[in-house]
Amino acid sequence: MKVKLITVGKLKEKYLKDGIAEYCKRLKRFTKFELEELPDEKIPNNASQAQNTYILEKEGQRILNKISNREFVIVLAIEGKQFSSEKFSQLLSATMLKGYSDLTFVIGGSLGLSQEVKKRASILMSFGLLTLPHQLMRLVFVEQIYRAFMIQEGSPYHK
């Protein structure tokens, strides 16, 4: 199975880059893991709702251009379904058993995601009502993907 994480915006902080790189390295033993950073749009100070919508649509089109019809897509959105680590691991297993060979996760930029991206999702997933910087969410989410594979393996990593 090929697993891809599409994100909006360039990661700036070294400690986040290092953490993500470590989990990407660990994931190689389970899957072909690909991280794709797409450019974000500049948000003007005091942007209007129309400007924000335009930015979301532009970023959304970039995301959709990276997703094929055959991919199972899980989009992180606050209104999505919450999963425990165990249930998330089961979801990944079930996706593989259904014959999907390409699994794509999407994390939006600071404004979130366009409705078109959410409509393309096979599943909307949420980490709860907490607000986290989208760059930090990348590290947390890559760790959870790694944890899901470790749970499938029966590893003591997940206690």
UniProtKB/Swiss-Prot annotation:
SUPFAM superfamilies: alpha/beta knot. GO terms for cellular component: cytoplasm. S-adenosyl-L-methionine binds at residues 76, 108, 127-132. One of its GO terms (molecular function) is rRNA (pseudouridine-N3-)-methyltransferase activity. It is found in: Cytoplasm. It comes from the Bacteria. It catalyses: pseudouridine(1915) in 23S rRNA + S-adenosyl-L-methionine = N(3)-methylpseudouridine(1915) in 23S rRNA + S-adenosyl-L-homocysteine + H(+). Its main location: cytoplasm. Keywords: Cytoplasm, Methyltransferase, rRNA processing, S-adenosyl-L-methionine, Transferase. Its EC number is 2.1.1.177. Belongs to the RNA methyltransferase RlmH family. Specifically methylates the pseudouridine at position 1915 (m3Psi1915) in 23S rRNA. Homodimer. This is Ribosomal RNA large subunit methyltransferase H. It comes from Streptococcus mutans serotype c (strain ATCC 700610 / UA159).
